[in-house]
């Protein structure tokens, strides 16, 4: 219904309510049951079972399930009753699925907690009484009261309003609070920004107070309609997910190909079909790193938990990897790069700038505070419209008790500020007389002044003095300060008299940059990341702040929304390469900026807090929503939520993302190298007509214990201290680039050769040589070689140069794996299960010599190849 086009009385009647009494509690309960709660609803949550079974879509997991099924079948057909292999495969697959579900739920709970922190209440009139209720219980027809500082709980038609201003940037992208008036007539079909007689859900009242009737709630509000559109969009696939899927498919196809080859070779050598099939299955088990999905998930989740402690809540685990590849960070100005708190930084008399701590400034601030509605809360905070809050805070800092001053000099009347007048004036009772105090835009207020206060004396205003004041104003404006003029005069009838005023001074204020933002921008530069400011503020203010922070270094790097609108696609595509500040832009411009940068192959992180920012957050590679000042819709659209709304947190998150990617790559490198070693060991033995050196259950133990535990510890490696001193990686680059693929194969060949040598030694070189002894030595050598090799994987530099035991988690995991290996080989029931026998000291000495060989060969290779650092 277009209730904004009706009078307030007609709207209230249409909604079946009463202006003074509101709805009855019974009627409100009835409407709540009919329309539902006043909440924004995201996508329908998947059930626990659905989330669990979704984990089984991974190609690697599917191959493991097939291997498990085949193993069950062969054990059954051979009537062995040995189901240990398939059961262990199933256990690890189920555990991996459980880990995935737990981490996803943990991220969802973090988000829910964030929403609950900002759960609003509403002041409502029901049964003729004013009461405070949860905003979720509001219904259409409720009469609500709003005042400065309130979050508007629902869309509502104003009934009465007094000097009302609302910050609608969350909805419209307009950074300046807009004036609202219950008496404004609005035509049907008007744009939302033109509807001045309504207030909208998720916007903030910055000044004044009003009574209104709720017209829409929940998903029917303006913000709800945008939320509904977002709920229909699917999450994009990240580069990490694509790469892992490719690795999984390659492993699966490779494993099946090798298995088929081994099966045919075995048949040709006269082996029975079932025996050949079991040998092929053992090779499939060796080829696939069963712990890989779980290791990646756990490494991601460990990184996410670490980042959450630094105020970055990750909503989607794979998005962490994308963060590490970011090449552009497009950030809002207000609240993210700046403190989002207007602060007085300059004051001028009629002749010159004056110290902020002097008596003249104290008197100026006190006078201006009398013409402000902002209030000092008594807790060191000031609530109200930002400009007025800055003036009151300055007065308090200079030693004026503003609340006491207002009681001593009460306001008797006022002429409120309006965008047309650009000034506000109040009548103040000062003892036996009444005075007028006015504040506003300097070029407007000076026209109302016939006198000037100079050195404590009132003298007539002259054209020369007027020009001097305007020059002072320009000087402050050139420093990107918002300037307010203050004037005072007498009044005779108790009402503000805006004629014949005496000019008192100028007050300059700004939203200062966050202290930590300076260093964060420098870090971006060192890391090859381009920081960009995108704001709805004026170009002059934006450029001044950007220069202070080091974002803007040359002229000609700023574009306004109006300039963007005039550009063709090709011209704009070229402009984004050099532009570092975008001013007076709309959320639609943000989407265009993101798409233009991505078209150049850039990986873009975009911040946003408003509902209209949601499309840009979705369009970006990494959407970063604000936790404090952000709307629920923006948070739902984002990949990451900054709980402190701080630019420096994004930069820390990028560093964390780089470190996590390094750890994932390190863990996968290690796992694949170990598995290639197992494949080559079994494959080579088959080619030479030897029995299988490793049994399926032994391979499973190696993959799940001596592979996976060190891989997890490698995933907990602390990021390189110089991680932000290198350029972003190319997100399109293969996982196996920069010789990584060759290294994996060479490392696998070494480990496989050492294990095969151990098998041959146990099978032929010792007095009690036999196949079982050979398998025992191969089993021990393969496990211990892989444990030793995990230390090589910490860095491409010498492991001794970084401290071989400096990763305590890896040291503990290595010791635990060695202890478990020893337990399996010495405890009789376990030894029988794994088909191993006890080793003599000479045999153990041989295994130990083979086990330390990977470190020796790795150190030799690093010394010859030079010190190449881990990427």
What does each of the following model-derived ranges do?
Residues 730-749, 771-777:
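Membrane-water interface at loop-to-transmembrane-helix junctions
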Residues 758-761, 783:
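C-terminal substrate-binding/catalytic lobe of Rossmann-fold NAD(P)-dependent dehydrogenases
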